[in-house]
């Protein structure tokens, strides 16, 4: 008798995606982050659902409803901090996942990669709107500053900003719609993740060498299910260490002050995972130029498929490209540090140099290094 998992219409889909899926035998722990992102998304949806049961999206009561969750709701504090720090874990996994894709040339899977870039944008939008919901000082001023960037768009900018605000400033209408979008977007992200997997399973996974693995593949279960469970346990352990020992480590103290439109905080900055993009935005004196650089800093990921000049897919056997990749990682860490610093000397010039280096590395140095690598191998 044929196994039900191979014949049942629903079980068959799960079987082909997670059980009998042929996977390369040599994929390393860098391939764990896809499943970890799935774990993070489920965790965020569940904790978010329980928070939404007690949260009120109204300027008068939003801040006190978050306080109520932490003080009066059974285990409300742990749900709240798991959700807040879960977002940080989500972005750590996202950056690792994207970094692995860049290093091993996964961007040559065009559809999978571009759906991934859309997923990154959707996740960033969700995180930004979620940060606005507690209605603390940094929530309010962060929402004001970031939405105001759209006013840099010629002709329609001001109208667009007021349309998003639902008035002439960030107020009740803005908070209500941000809550609505913050609630619906994770489900859209989940649907996009399925599309992402669908395209991935059309081609099969990439491997560290970047060459076809058709000759040497193993079933996904039990080998990679066990590996993914280990990764998930380590992720949850790391998250719980953060939640139980230093829940406010990655947050901003200003967000424990209720939002006040009449009092601007001395340093307005987003959450740590947006600081690299914020530093690029701030390093350009022109408003429209800054906004374009901000968008391009993420959108540039889609260009990798066009500017890949190497005859090899992975960086595994390309030492010059490897060196440039790690310089890029160091540059992004520098930008993250600069984004959290005040706008004064020497941070301004460091930010500008790091921003120039970021775009130069991706658009000029990496393609040149790949061409040099080809010539050295006489290809």
Curated annotation (Swiss-Prot):
GO terms for biological process: mitochondrial electron transport, ubiquinol to cytochrome c. It is found in: Mitochondrion inner membrane. GO terms for molecular function: metal ion binding; ubiquinol-cytochrome-c reductase activity. Heme b b562 binds at residues 83, 182. Pfam families: Cytochrom_B_C, Cytochrome_B. The chain crosses the membrane at residues 33-53, 77-98, 113-133, 178-198, 226-246, 288-308, 320-340, 347-367. Heme 1 (or BL or b562) is low-potential and absorbs at about 562 nm, and heme 2 (or BH or b566) is high-potential and absorbs at about 566 nm. This is Cytochrome b. It comes from Madoqua guentheri. The gene is MT-CYB.
């Amino acid at each position: 008798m044929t196994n039900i998992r191979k014949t049942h219409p629903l079980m068959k889909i799960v079987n082909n995606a997670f059980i009998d899926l042929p996977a390369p035998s040599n994929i390393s722990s860098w391939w764990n982050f896809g499943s970890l992102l799935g774990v993070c998304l489920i965790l965020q949806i569940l904790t978010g659902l329980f928070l939404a049961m007690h949260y009120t999206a109204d300027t008068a009561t939003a801040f006190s409803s978050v306080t109520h969750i932490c003080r009066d709701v059974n285990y409300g504090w742990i749900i709240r901090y798991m959700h807040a720090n879960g977002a940080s874990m989500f972005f750590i996994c996202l950056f690792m996942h994207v970094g692995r894709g860049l290093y091993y040339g996964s961007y040559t899977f065009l559809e999978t990669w571009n759906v991934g870039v859309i997923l990154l944008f959707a996740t960033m939008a969700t995180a930004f709107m979620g940060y606005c919901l507690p209605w603390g000082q940094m929530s309010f001023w962060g929402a004001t500053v970031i939405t105001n960037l759209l006013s840099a768009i010629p002709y329609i900018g001001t109208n667009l900003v007021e349309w998003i605000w639902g008035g002439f400033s960030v107020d009740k209408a803005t908070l209500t719609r941000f809550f609505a979008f913050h609630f619906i977007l994770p489900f859209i992200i989940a649907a996009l993740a399925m599309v992402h997997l669908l395209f991935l399973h059309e081609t099969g996974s990439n491997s560290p060498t970047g060459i076809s693995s058709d000759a040497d593949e193993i079933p996904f279960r039990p080998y990679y299910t066990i590996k993914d469970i280990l990764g998930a346990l380590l992720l949850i352990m790391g998250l719980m260490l953060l939640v139980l020992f230093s829940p406010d480590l990655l947050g901003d103290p200003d967000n424990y002050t209720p939002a006040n439109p009449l009092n601007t905080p001395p340093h307005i900055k987003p959450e740590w995972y947006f600081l690299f993009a914020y530093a690029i935005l701030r390093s350009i004196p022109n408003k429209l130029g800054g906004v374009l650089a901000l968008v391009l800093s993420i959108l540039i990921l889609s260009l990798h498929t066009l500017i890949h000049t190497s005859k090899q897919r992975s960086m595994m056997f390309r030492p010059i490209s490897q060196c440039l990749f790690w310089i890029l990682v160091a540059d992004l860490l520098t930008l993250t540090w600069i984004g959290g610093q005040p706008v004064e000397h020497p941070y301004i010039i460091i930010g500008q140099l790091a921003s120039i280096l970021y775009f130069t590395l991706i658009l000029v140095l990496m393609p040149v290094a790949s061409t040099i690598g080809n010539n050295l191998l006489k290809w």
